Amino acid sequence: KFSIGIPAYKAKYLYNCIESILNQTYKNFELIIVNDASPEDLDTIVSRFNDERIIYSTNEKNYGAEEVIGNWNKCLSFATGEYFILMGDDDTLDKHYLEEFYKTIQEYPESNVFHCRSNIIDENSAIISLTQSWPQRESLLDNMWHRLNGFRQQFISDFVYKRNFLIENNGFFYNKLAWASDDITAYQAMRDNGIIHINKALLNYRRSPITISSSGSVELK
């Protein structure tokens, strides 16, 4: 079973995000949406979906960009699945995302972390570019070298983690503004058995004018 967590704040693309998850060909999952005390009307968007797999919670106080890791780990705290995915509220999944990861996990059950290629899309969902292909299996040191030298474009929703690994390591690595928190969490997960990669673009990662980037910084474009 997969648990997909959306730390939600922006309304603009949330419907599309949720719809892409509920349209998965692999059906054994739960969708956790944690509204980070958004000033936008997320309740109405979520209420349009009548699906018992949705768990919806609203924070009393906004974590904000500086403490965004708190909301990432809040999503994780609700999860009951064996594998966990953290989803950007403006990204979308290919309908075969979970099915492809499920098949790959069966081949490499010892691994703590899995990854896929991504389409980078614009505000109108047009594809701008495709991220690089990787080896099917890569060690921690190889991945770090390629990442630090600019040969690995990766985000957050393109990773699938073994939930027990995240729980045992106190969730996603804490840094203010989530600076490199996603990368450090992935490196920790790769330590023992590397990372397993699917060379198919299963995530649509949206480049928008204001977003929290994959390195945790606030991008203004």
Task: Give the location of each predicted region.
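Conserved nucleotide-sugar donor-binding catalytic segment
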Residues: 4, 116, 134-219
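Short, well-formed alpha-helical segments that are part of the catalytic scaffolds
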Residues: 10-23
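Acidic donor-binding segment of Leloir-type glycosyltransferases
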Residues: 20-61
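Glycine-rich, basic loop-to-helix element that forms the pyrophosphate-binding segment
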Residues: 60-79
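Short aromatic/hydrophobic "clamp" motif used to bind/position activated sugar donors
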Residues: 84
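The conserved acidic donor/metal-binding loop of glycosyltransferases
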Residues: 88-92, 117
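Conserved donor NDP-sugar-binding/catalytic core segment of glycosyltransferases
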Residues: 96-130
